[in-house]
Regions:
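Core segments of cupin and vicinal oxygen chelate
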Residues: 12-64
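Short, solvent-exposed beta-strand edge segments and adjacent coil->beta transition regions
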Residues: 5-9, 79-83
């Protein structure tokens, strides 16, 4: 059995929602699965304080990317300093991920959101990246001005801004 399949895997620290969160993320993204669930043993309870047999770690994959979710307790919470970007090829895809990831969460500016577990995501159209990399600084400036006014990205509105049309 090969345990390590990629060099780096984000470890997400939850209070006690690791398995629930992993199941949610696996339901949102294609090519996703839960690989293993590890449980707390009797040993070490004086340190970890978790009931024996309760979920300790969940090894899972989102869109082929390996993650680990850990039920470590309430000491640490997620913040915006670390987030995950979801690259989308179409408005339908932007809409889907925005809807699913904000279920029980909170919308933010410029494509950012917090999911129901407090994890930060940015749902990003690939077209936006292409427009922002244009050598014509006036085009990318118009796109930036447009997306700074948005929560969920609107690809057609971004394209209109890129072309110099009124948004």
């Amino acid at each position: 059995m090969q345990i390590i399949t990629q060099k780096i895997a984000p470890c997400l620290w939850f209070d006690s929602e690791a398995e629930e969160a992993a199941k949610f993320y696996v339901s949102v993204f294609k090519n996703s699965k839960i690989n293993t669930v590890g449980r707390y043993p009797d040993e070490g309870q004086e340190i970890h304080g978790k009931p024996a047999g309760s979920v300790m770690v969940v090894d899972f994959e989102i869109a082929g990317q390996k993650f680990v979710a850990l039920n470590g307790g309430p000491q640490f919470t997620f913040d915006e300093a670390v987030s995950f970007q979801v690259y989308c090829e179409s408005q339908d895809e932007v809409d889907y991920f925005w809807r699913r990831l904000t279920e029980g969460g909170k919308e933010g500016p410029c494509g950012w959101l917090k999911d129901r577990y407090g994890l930060s995501w940015q749902v990003v159209p690939v077209a936006l990246l292409e427009m922002m990399l244009d050598r014509d600084a006036s085009k990318s400036a118009r796109v930036m001005a447009a997306f700074m006014q948005m929560k969920k990205f609107d690809i057609e509105a971004l394209k209109r801004a890129y072309e110099g049309e009124t948004v």
